[in-house]
Amino acid sequence: MYAKRAKEIFDEEIHELEKLRDSINTTFDQVVEVLYHCQGKVVMMGIGKTGIIAHKMAASFASTGTPSIFVNAAEAVHGDLGMINGKDVAVLVSNSGSTNEILNIVDPLHRLGCTIVAMTGNLDSPLAQRADYALSIHVDEEACPLGIAPTTSTTATLLMGDALMV
């Protein structure tokens, strides 16, 4: 019974990931070029569950030799922006694209001269509109039947991060 449900969850997530894969466009190419030519470090930022994924992304980029750090978006405006400069590329991860903690750091990052890449499930969001580049991590449905735990969206974010890294 549980094994059957587990397979259904796999199938649901795979279906959403295939749709996301098919939506990848030339913006992805542009972001890869920006990351490749970054003269500073790649700064991954997020909060909550997307922050956990962004932290993993920073660690993976660092594993491949790309200078990368994670900065919690909520801490950024309380002094942690001091470790960021205009040579850095900031990757802001927010499924909704309207999280206040993320939006509050966009203007300070622009003032520092950072290139901003948004990874969001909503390309019409304030974050996507204010970023230099916006990558979709949109999924139509979460695998969580209650709709309260990010499941498919975090998997999609993790996979997009891995695709950027390798």
Per-segment meaning from a language model:
Residues G40-V166:
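Glycine-rich phosphate-binding loops that contact phosphosugars or nucleotide phosphates
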Residues M1-G40:
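An N-terminal, well-structured beta->alpha segment
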